[in-house]
Amino acid sequence: DSGLLAVSVESFRDYELKNAWTWEHQALTRARFCAGDSDVGRRFEEIRCEILRLPRELAKLKEEVVAMRHKMYDAHALKSETEFALKHDAGGIIDVEFIVQYLVLGYAHQHASLTGNLGNIALLRMAGELGLIDPQQAEAVGNAYREYRRLQHAKRLSAFPKAPIPREGIEQHVAAVNDLWKAVFAN
């Protein structure tokens, strides 16, 4: 069965604390209350921050984030030498988002500011300022993400919104994202 799931706020908290998968916590890094009772929204945000600020074993977290990324890559990546799928290819949007999600989940217990509703570029910059990643890499990947989103928005207005783009012209962005991915997940 599928459909809208309605549970109490405390049941949601209990599930997130005891049963949620890592990918569900990754989704919480992006989740925001947007409509409804403001008390429920406030409580949701408290729970979201509580969950994101839990200490985690970094090696296990890395393993789970990388495994999920591999599943997505295997299912959706273009894997072309001349064309690039902005969202799914290695060095693309999902890699940036997974890096940020890992940094939030891995370090928010030490740096609560990582749970703010700031966006990926600001969170990359903050991670650089906190010494979690190299600040120059943070800036380069932030620039890559900004360009990817610009290209993604332009494609959505075109007749072919899901078509890949040429790799030519974005190689430096792909390389920057791949370099940060290796720096974060290779050790």
Please provide the spans of the model-predicted regions:
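A nucleotide- and high-energy phosphate-metabolite-utilizing enzyme signature
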Residues: 1-187
